[in-house]
Amino acid sequence: MAPWSSLYRYVLPDTPGCPELVVDQNLRQAAIDFLRDSGAYVVNVPAFAYTADVSAYTHAPAADTQLSGVIEARVAGQTHSMQLGTPSIAYNARTALYPSVFIAGDDNINFTLWPTPTVSGTLAYRYSAYPTQTAATVPDIVVAQWADAIARGAKARILALPGKSYTNAKLASLYEQQFRATINRAKILRQRGALTAGTRVRFWPFGV
């Protein structure tokens, strides 16, 4: 994990006189917007054991991050259908014996395996995340891949602040356009599985 100061060199030269605290706040918000809207930060969670006759499990996202969405879940090595929420009688009757993983929660990732497993096995999953509003750090891989994009988002916000020595509405608008364009590019790369060399990231919407 990298501190926000690791991104200063992309921001401070273009925002002279801006306090570092303000830079931190706007870098954080830019990172939140970028990763939430693009899904570009994907965490692959190694398989963990589940036990027979126990259907509910809870995991916490990585430090300083919060869940954006679960992309894929594999139970006993097989990809399962994912649904948002919890199982219902109507769903159970409609899909008799079709295996599903139900996802719920914000601060934690709550899984419900349905039908309840009758034997022990493993569950592995991958999810997208973004920084919390109090995050003091950002994942290293995000800095390596998207430092310039996040910096442009931060500069757009900083330069749009009214009445400051560094206020520049025209440049702020340009940076905002570039920031949004890069979000769209990152979203496409994620859907194509091209974000990280050697790692395939498959887009799997809820309910499929």
Feature locations, PLM:
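Glycine-enriched, solvent-exposed interface loops adjoining structured elements
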Residues: 1-208
